[in-house]
């Protein structure tokens, strides 16, 4: 019976790798070279440093998934380790980071499509494309986890070919003079590195993706750790090599104002046809990332709602087995963010940067908690004594990496992030009160 139940689950190794890579290699990948261009070669060093931190976080999540696979990922582990209140805050913050990142990815999709088809380049069309992308992907996810996983596989493997070609073949086109400056910003090294942390970390968000839908993963104790590490390794290689190529091919002055740095690099190396192929890959990449994050957007609050820590609406499952109402509510909040930007308050680039910092801040806090959760989760599972799992160097590096990223987000993003976390307190109090009433009946 156990085997039958496991074989009926929707996500295997290929789908889990696709979800991890698809979530990580999104807008942060192909927009980041322009954002980090003022930092020169220091940006490449930071991709490597943050990649090491991401791998350590991935190993931490892999150990947790092997010990206690549970739907909800970071939320589930935080609740096991620290109790209901910490679990709620982690679920709340993680959920915010997911739906707040959707407009940033959708903005990138709209920008890439308008760059490809200049006739679409106007404010009304940008708004329509952004919202259309979000709600089209919501429609795919409402069809079920299997459909979302298949879509993740198709979009991920479709975008790896052009991005991989630039990252590998493009190395032969790098001009040494474009890579001559290590830290041209003139800022102290630590300050410059800290400023790069959220920009690079945003591209690594999603490293835990395979742990979130654990209840739908076949052979979860083996599949989740393997897919997590494979996905991080693929993404890190693309980030480091891709950034070297773009910085080494596109002149710095041109790169600083670029809205499509990978397309610019492809154009300089191979002509307009290659730039067109990259633009198409960016569009596919954005849709794939939107799909993966939408999948997670419903799973985390669903797990919390089933534990009576989130409103019950988030835990209601449709006939197709998906938390449909939770996905729709989350997408509606993302739509409000898009509408706020469309009202003319912040510019698109400034708003994108704010969303990057906010999403990074609210996602990295759960990472920090989970990095130290292993021995507590082991105790929750009844494993105590000399042979029980303990914190190692990997977990301590992951924790330090998370703290450094929070520091790099800056006071404004930290303040916004903490404010959003505190706004969840009335929800927690209300849910606990409702749970006590149900227990008393």
What kind of region is each of these model predictions?
Residues 1-34, 38-39, 55, 59, ...:
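Membrane-interface "cap" regions at the ends of multi-pass membrane proteins
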Residues 1-4, 76-79, 106-129, 162, ...:
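Helix-loop-helix connectors at the membrane interface of multi-pass transporters/channels
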Residues 2-8, 43-44, 120-126, 154-280, ...:
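Helix-loop-helix junctions that connect adjacent transmembrane segments
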Residues 8, 31-123, 129, 231-237, ...:
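Extracellular loop-to-transmembrane helix junctions
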Residues 76-77, 83, 114-119, 229-294, ...:
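TM-loop-TM module centered on a large, flexible mid-protein loop between adjacent transmembrane helices
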Residues 125-176, 187-188, 228-232, 360-368, ...:
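Membrane-interface loop-to-helix entry segments
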Residues 363, 376, 388-441:
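A generic transmembrane alpha-helix motif of multi-pass inner-membrane proteins
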């Amino acid at each position: 019976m156990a085997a039958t139940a496991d074989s009926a689950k929707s996500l295997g190794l290929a789908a889990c790798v696709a979800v991890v890579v698809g979530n990580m290699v999104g807008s942060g990948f192909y927009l980041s070279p322009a954002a980090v261009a003022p930092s020169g070669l220091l940006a490449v060093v930071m991709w490597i440093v943050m990649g090491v931190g991401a791998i350590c976080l991935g190993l931490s999540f892999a150990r947790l998934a092997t010990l206690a696979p549970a739907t909800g990922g970071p939320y589930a582990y935080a609740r096991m380790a620290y109790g209901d209140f910490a679990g709620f805050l982690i679920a709340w913050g993680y959920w915010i980071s997911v739906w707040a990142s959707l407009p940033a990815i959708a903005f990138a999709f709209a920008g890439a499509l308008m760059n490809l088809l200049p006739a679409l380049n106007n404010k009304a069309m940008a708004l329509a494309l952004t919202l259309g992308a979000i709600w089209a992907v919501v429609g795919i996810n409402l069809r079920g986890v299997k459909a979302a996983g298949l879509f993740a596989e198709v979009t991920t493997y479709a975008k790896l070919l052009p991005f991989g070609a630039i990252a590998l073949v493009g190395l032969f086109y790098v001009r040494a003079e474009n890579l001559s400056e290590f830290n041209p910003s003139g800022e102290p090294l630590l300050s410059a590195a800290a400023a790069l942390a959220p920009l690079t970390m945003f591209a690594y968000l999603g490293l835990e993706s395979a742990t979130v839908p654990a209840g739908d993963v076949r052979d979860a104790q083996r599949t989740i750790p393997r897919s997590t590490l494979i996905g991080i390794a693929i993404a890190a290689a693309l980030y480091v090599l891709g950034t070297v190529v773009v910085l080494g091919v596109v002149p710095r002055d041109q790169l600083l104002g670029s809205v499509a740095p990978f397309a610019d690099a492809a154009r300089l190396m191979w002509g307009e046809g290659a730039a067109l192929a990259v633009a198409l890959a960016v569009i596919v990449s954005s849709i794939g990332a939107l799909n993966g994050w939408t999948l997670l957007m419903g799973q985390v609050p669903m797990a919390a709602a089933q534990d009576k820590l989130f409103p019950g609406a988030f835990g209601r499952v449709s006939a197709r087995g998906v938390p449909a109402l939770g996905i729709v509510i989350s997408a509606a909040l993302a739509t409000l963010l898009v509408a706020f930007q469309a009202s003319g308050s912040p510019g698109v680039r400034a708003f994108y940067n704010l969303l990057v910092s906010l999403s990074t801040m609210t996602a990295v806090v759960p990472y920090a908690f989970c990095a130290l959760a292993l021995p507590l989760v082991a105790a929750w599972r009844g494993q105590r004594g000399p042979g029980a799992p303990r914190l190692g160097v990997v977990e301590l590096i992951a924790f330090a990496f998370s703290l450094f990223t929070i520091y790099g987000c800056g006071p404004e993003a930290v303040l916004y992030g903490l404010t959003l976390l505190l706004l969840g307190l009335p929800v927690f109090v209300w849910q606990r009160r409702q749970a006590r009433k149900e227990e008393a009946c």
